[in-house]
Amino acid sequence: MAEPRIFTSVDELKAAVGEQLGYTDWLEVDQKRIDLFADATGDHQWIHVDPEKAAAGPFGTTIAHGYLTLSLLPLFGPQLIAVEGVKMGVNYGTNKVRFPSPVPVGSRLRATARITGVEDVPGGVQVTVAFTVEREGGDKPVCVAESVSRYYG
């Protein structure tokens, strides 16, 4: 498993702004994961859940939902960054989310990230991390997004 970069202070986080945090392990996106996401969200569009119809469609197969790809950030994040010495961390939001390329069923994905901002907030710190999710063999990212987290001491 990928080993995260461990930060033990706000000063360490601030000093790392702009640095690339490495790569996660590869994750295969299979039809079961796509179907479960469709069930959880109610998005059963045929390009995601109907392999027969999708085979004749624009992608030649089913593809993962863009939001499924985005939802992998909580899985990928801990493989890249860990903040120690805090009582809790919470998701605060996302910025600049885009899905430049589709994720065909069976694709293997991994993420890389860099810290783009660290700001003091009441009781803690806000950290912005720019994620890029790529598909093995792909020429464009499948998801780019800024994830905003807050850590409270």
Language-model regions: role of each:
Residues 1-15, 102-153:
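HotDog/MaoC-like acyl-thioester-processing domains
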Residues 2-64, 81:
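Catalytic strand-loop segment that frames the active site of acyl-thioester-processing enzymes
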Residues 19, 23-25, 33, 43, ...:
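A generic structural signal for short beta-strands and their flanking turns/coil linkers
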Residues 22, 26-28, 98, 104, ...:
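Generic structural detector for well-ordered beta-strands
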Residues 35-38, 70-74:
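Predominant activation on well-ordered alpha-helical scaffold segments within soluble catalytic domains
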Residues 55-64, 71-112:
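Hydrophobic beta-strand-centered segment that forms part of the acyl-chain substrate-binding groove
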Residues 66-68, 142:
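An amphipathic alpha-helix/helix-turn recognition signal
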